Design a protein with these regions (language model features):
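Short, Lys/Arg-enriched N-terminal segments with co-localized hydrophobic residues
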Residues: 4-15
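Compact, Lys/Arg-rich rRNA/RNP-binding cores from ribosome-related proteins
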Residues: 37
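N-terminal glycine-rich anion-binding loops that anchor highly charged ligand groups
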Residues: 40-46
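Intrinsically disordered, low-complexity repeat regions of secreted/extracellular protein precursors
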Residues: 195-196, 201, 206
Length: 210
């Protein structure tokens, strides 16, 4: 059973997070979903993950699974075809304006800005897809490998220094998302308090009028 804090209930009211054919998104309490993001249907967002402005995650033909401490950055699109799930592991960074369609992204990967990854492709653990690259259908990207180009091809191993830098990036987004979430919840609490005070005042004024 899904349990959502008030913040997510507000997003439901705005219809940005909504069910499809009776299946509602399952969003971890510690995750952050920006109010402008659209999350539909069979979508799971793991603990301390973040979904940023204008992202669309549309789980209307199958499951979209986003692991823990993963960031889906601004304007990215997540979708799939029937029978081809979309799975994103833990500690994955998905850059701005990325398209992920029915693919598998293993843990600790970095997907560069504007990359496109198509049905059946698998990105191995710790791999990097360079900005603007196209990973073709059913392609296999080896673990800890940098690929780039159209179509994307292996260029070299990911260095330990790069891996450490990417891990810092993951930590940065987890911390930033927590700040965004706290501010959103504070704003919502302030609005709720103001609405309650306004309602109480209306009741008092009505009583005086009698």
């Amino acid at each position: 059973m899904n349990v959502y804090p008030r913040f997510f209930i507000v997003l439901y009211k705005l219809k940005m997070i909504r069910s499809f054919r009776g299946i509602a998104p399952n969003i971890a309490v510690s995750a952050y979903v920006d109010p402008s993001a659209v999350v539909i249907g069979d979508v799971t967002v793991g603990a301390h993950s973040s979904v940023w402005p204008n992202v669309t995650a549309r789980g209307d033909t199958g499951p979209i699974r986003i692991g823990a401490e993963t960031s889906i950055q601004d304007n990215s699109v997540l979708h799939l075809d029937e029978g081809i799930p979309l799975t994103i592991g833990d500690r994955v960074t998905v850059g701005h304006s990325v398209v992920l369609h029915g693919c598998t992204i293993e843990d600790d990967c970095l997907i560069g800005i504007g990359a496109i990854i198509l049905n059946g492709a698998r990105i191995g653990k710790g791999a990097v897809v360079a900005a603007g690259s196209l990973v073709a259908e059913n392609a296999e990207v080896p673990a800890a490998t940098l690929v780039m180009g159209v179509p994307a091809k292996p260029k070299r191993p990911v260095t330990p220094e790069e891996q450490a830098r990417f891990a810092e990036g993951v930590k940065h987004y987890v911390e930033k998302a927590a700040v965004y979430k706290a501010e959103a919840q504070q704003a919502e609490a302030s609005q709720a308090a103001a609405e309650k005070a306004e309602a109480s005042q209306a009741v008092a004024e009505k009583a005086e009028a009698r």
